[in-house]
């Protein structure tokens, strides 16, 4: 067993991808050259290893070049290939004996199936173009030629598939044996080289005889730097850009469905150990699954639409027959959910498809020579504008295919209409499927439990008064989860000295960097909790029986629905109840679980379909098996036996009351849950008067609240459907022993051992002892707020009082008292179980580096002006500046009057809401921090209630006073690692002097993400613990999301050292740090910088009342309420300065004791720590060695950062050229016009000039002496990003994603090339997420935009000719006019600004999001002013772009005006709209 938190084989990957095909199937060498050119133009989307030369992998998958293969077979083997043949492209070990074994095994399997092996060809390669790391692991690359035998007939591809799979199985321990492709239709060329070197490496690719008609290409960006040759893409059918979030569930389900994958073509597939691989990349598993479906005889289009369906459950405008097709498919396979741009070919068709959220870009062009090219970016190869026949993009849930045999280009509608009419799906569903209805019998009526029995159950299942009041009451009253503030300062379950629920061990995972979270409120259209009841059937057959299922709209059952479900008379839904009660006198917990699994297996083999796992009706002397243990154990046991798809697991439990507890059950495999105890407790609360109203309504509200909570937990991980989440185990178990994990939660992370079956049983026995004592009342709780004598809180009244006394008086002896309270407490965090080893001879204190050297290592954590009062925010900034540390502005912008003064924050934060992020804000920072996640609520957005948005905050955030401000869960320009690299590049261009920091939250796998961040050229990484604070967050997030920094920090430190990147990047940690001892331990675990959030607030007077979210903070620290601030804020700059000086003093004393003079000598020195025995049985079973040792880390690897900045590979040459040309015009304010050529490799163009202007002239920019730049060509990503006032950019050509992102002024104008022949309003001209977070300026584009145009726009004016989904999302200001079609979900979360939308086909009413906006016609008399305004807007647009579409509208204005809608927030008055738009000029 290898020790350590980071394993080198862990990775995530994202990339650039594409395909090119000749529509008539004409093969040519030119097509191949064009593909390689396109691939090379996306080099910036890939990654480069630490050696600067090894790529993360790129490759090509070609339609079989028949004539070339016949010639090389003749030359190399002296054989004439017959009519049908296959070529294998194979990596073999670089060792004679191992190579021979690989060859012989594969040949034997092929021969066994009656195929003729003709021989092997050595593929000519040039290793000199490889980097050192690629050379190190370079395999022997061979091609194998095979022909069908006499008997083979039409099963040639099946025989090749089965032979290869059997060979792989036989060679599973030989990791250097890999079959890239083995097919009669396609052949693969891939490897660990840079795209530009691919044709030099493979001589075949430079051979003009090699001609093909289809080529799929891919360029990889992996988060680790130990790339492997087999992981390069494309795989055998597809190349995938994105990340399958539900991969563990998809793999588990696929492998348990063996019997459902047998078909006439695949009769013996059940012989395989695995249907899809369970290790390796998610994309390769997806490729395996697709390959099984196609080999089994399924049509390519149906297979991919089944694996990655579009959103269909909530789309009102979807055709009924098409919905039936998706519903029917969903009954037998769950979606592979997550960001996915997929390109694939089977040798005849070339196909591209996007996931339901459309989170990867895909742009296509058809040219006159018959080529169709599709790629992550437009402009990846050089064509003349006049040769373009059509261009467009693939949107969310869309698919595009080219059939090279018939020459057809098939769009989404064409493919969907073929699929939906293949079988009478709608009729079958009508006849066979039914929604579960409530049972109306007397038996089904809810029966209240008597008070005495209920008291026993509440004690046994650990329900406290606090849970009744804080969790169940808000759910029952309003259908909302309880909200709290501050962080979680209680011990984790494994460290607690009290009995804690098993679900408290589980920490929710969340998406960060490599994939985005989703907004479950504003994007509900893609979310679904629908579940199917009934046994799954064979996927290759289509019959009415396949539709014979019961459908649950929600998986949390009401009493009546539960009764209806378990009393079905239909044998297809036969049920059996399995009791979870066991007698501890005769059996232990582990034996009880084994017996339960055996019982479940017997029921499944006996044709029972519903297995009801129940802990209701416990009797005295019995203990309940925890529902999560039971579900996990049964799910895995039946999965291993391939029985799981035959049954549904229904859980009747007292252990699931809140959304987190439910999510744990679904995550480990439950189908539906009936929370019997929660319903009984709510009935009791009605009896006691804690709840008023109708009990049935309370139960209904409770279920609604749980559904919202479940959506939030799914969406944190970027998952849309419960069907995909079920069994995905997206948790980390902190502190559960391997025996528990192996039996019940196989494959879930648990890294430090801990509580085993014996300890779990012991805790239950203690609970049972009290439960049956009538005099023992139920517990008060104390998990949310401090209750004397209950759970320990790190910020208890004694600690707060001691800290405030020390800093108010500036008394170091009082500080010692505070430090002792924290440092000498019983273990409450993981670091409390680590003790320092004093040196034999301490160092004299005067030899230790002085306080002044240590203070610059301390930062205050990001807290926005909005969450904090202005007084508190400025006091923090001033104190940090005076001590030499750095304060962080948080995500609410900063008042420009503070720039350049002692009250300015050196760290400026860029969060998902982009509030107040202007060029001047960015230019006035020493560090730019990208806040990817927040410790208290990772994977979630934020919300500043309207009550806190006063005049000042509205001005700083470019919003309207009194209107709620929403920040989205993800950054809409970070859906993947290469997107983050782009944002870092944008920031380094606008402010080349600043360092860029990325804030992450601890979770398993954060090491791989951090190496990706380092490879994306960040300068700093902050690792936050789960216990960070927040101004407002759902209680389930505060308590259950994210992991401790003590696990995340050493994992990142180890990962960076293993990957040779630790010397390039600074590491910081934050979350619950209070004393000098915390700093010392963090340094030893790998940090060189330290962040403090809550403690400085407490130093300023915060009393930790946890009411920040209510805006009535009693100490004036976290409120905008003027009276509270004036009368109660007592904080001073000195209090904060005392706090940080005292920490530094304590750090020095401890360094002296350890015999260390410089803090840098401490970093990573885990030999100075030792683990101590804990005080509880669970604590004693913990194994903290993975934090301290990693067997993969090279001993000589640096322990800390050794460079000033991590310089990007791309110097941004175009920006240098633009700035050099304009320098004089900017410095002398002399104006001017300049011309430049541009390509898609020129990214963030304009940013360097804008940053220079903002630094020199502030927000005003060059308004009085504007400068114009004109470009021709195709612009790379982020054209016009952070555009300053007075800078005008004109582009003739196309642009990619993020045009005008964060612009603050000036103009960005984009028009099609003069020679183009297509209609602009039907053609994409700019990419996704344009104008994100813009605060001013004007954008005109004569063409359509992609997804999320104008997301978080708070002041820019824009006119475009069409838009994708989610246009104007979260908009708070400005104007958007769309002169053409829009996608769905227009105006979701829009609280300011307004839009004009042309709706010629009258579908807009179904496309806008009705929650916050309303629409008005513009052609009425009352709207005369708006009509005039709209006309002026279009006239200006035509004057700037010459748009034909605009001209047509103006010429027939009286007719077109009838089709326009005005879209505005419900909260805004019509009269005020025009005043606002006129107030915000350029």
From Swiss-Prot:
Reaction(s) catalysed by this chain's protein:
2 L-glutamate + NADP(+) = L-glutamine + 2-oxoglutarate + NADPH + H(+)
Report residues binding FMN.
1049-1101
Q: What Gene Ontology biological process does one annotation of this record name?
A: ammonia assimilation cycle
InterPro entries tied to this protein:
Aldolase_TIM, ET-N_metabolism_enzyme, GATase_2_dom, Glu_synth_asu_C, Glu_synth_asu_C_sf, Glu_synth_centr_N, Glu_synthdom, Ntn_hydrolases_N
- Tell me the protein family, please: Belongs to the glutamate synthase family.
What is the purpose of this protein?
Catalyzes the conversion of L-glutamine and 2-oxoglutarate into two molecules of L-glutamate.
Database matches in NCBIfam families: PRK11750.1
Q: What is this protein called?
A: Glutamate synthase [NADPH] large chain
Say which species the protein is native to: Halomonas elongata (strain ATCC 33173 / DSM 2581 / NBRC 15536 / NCIMB 2198 / 1H9)
- Gene symbol here is gltB
